[in-house]
Amino acid sequence: IDTAHGLGMSVMLDVVYNHFGPDGNYLPSYAAPFFRHDIPTPWGAAIDFRQPAVRRFFQENALYWLTEYRFDGLRLDAVHAIPDHDWLVELATFVRGQIPAPRRIHLVLENDDNRASLLDAGYDAQWNDDAHHVLHHLLTGEASGYYADYAARPGDNLARCLAEGWLFQGQPSEYRHGLPRGEPSAHLAPTSFVLFLQNHDQIGNRMRGDRLTDLAATRERLRAAVALQLLAPQIPLMFMGEEHGSQTPFLYFTSHADPELAAAVREGRRKEFASFPEFGGGDPNIPDPNSEATYAASNPWLKARGADGGEWLAWYGTLLRLRHHAISPRLAGTRSLGACSLGTHGVHAQWLLGDGALLTLYANMGAATQPLPPTLKPSEIHRAAMLFQSGEEAFSEACGGNLHRDSIIWLLEERS
């Protein structure tokens, strides 16, 4: 961590406070009151955050990582699985009180419940699963499982995610059997949301751990999605190997010492995918999670990068440098000016950056050219300064009133 700090890099730690591991956890044997048996979880009885000693245990653990090891922040795993929501507010208050300014501590959530109130109560940001799911559908066409909630009107869905953060802000979810999900989030800053195209869950939980380099409909569409992700005001997150277009799968792997537990996990994976015909219908050749070979096969550097890897590195490098110089210095105080869909697969969005500059996005994630509506005048595009285009013809075609297929355009207008 000290070495990273010397290089100007921050380091965050992913902490799991919603459960202990299923293997090697002996705490129930000598501290049974630590758990509550009225709430079962896939990992056993739930942790009892009603107990003051339990709450203090995890507060001290967070402080330990931040003070003894000097991590710059924590990413809290799956906090929707913690039934005592008030403890999360208590944790943020405790950490902020123990580590006051000027030291900056980042507290980031993974929360399937989309609780905006936590981002109003001491947490900095949340991983934006909604935006990922919309973009994944647009890139791959997949519409089963939880992607079913995002397959209808993907252009509208992406527009809402870019303008307001989450798609689900209290409306019912079909995938969750009609139960409401989420809280209103339009009042939050764009930097309250972490935007990603891939992560360890979204790849590793797939049957074969396949990446977007294998799944995306076209290479051009994936390049456009990367340009959207890295230049949007939301915080970009990249998964290892994305930057060089890795095609090595990231498989689901474990290291359980208990043979019975390893067998149960192996069988559970097969049953999980039995109802997904596109994933093999329970194919018995699913990689064994507890095999060391499965772990070894997930090394993102396993396959030689070649020329294609170099092209991806150059693509990411160009976009990250552009973000560093043109976007990041202006993010404080940025607010959305709204977004709208362009056809089924396109979107137009605008943000007023902190220094008054206007950032504009035109994206077409579809296979056909998308005519611009009369309300978006090509002459205004022509007058604006182009920040980036994902294809050589994208900007010129937009000036003529059409968005090229699988393309994206960013405009940046300075305002004094």
Where are these regions (language model features)?
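Generic recognition of stable, solvent-exposed alpha-helical segments in well-folded globular domains
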Residues: 8-11, 53, 57-60, 83-90, ...
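Carbohydrate-interacting/catalytic domains
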Residues: 210, 214-223, 228-238, 242-416
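Conserved alpha/beta catalytic core and glycan-binding cleft of carbohydrate-active enzymes
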Residues: 92-280
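Short, glycine/charged-enriched secondary-structure capping and boundary segments
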Residues: 25-28, 88-91, 121-123, 253-255, ...
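Generic, well-ordered alpha-helical scaffold segments in large soluble proteins
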Residues: 3-7, 61-64, 68, 91-94, ...
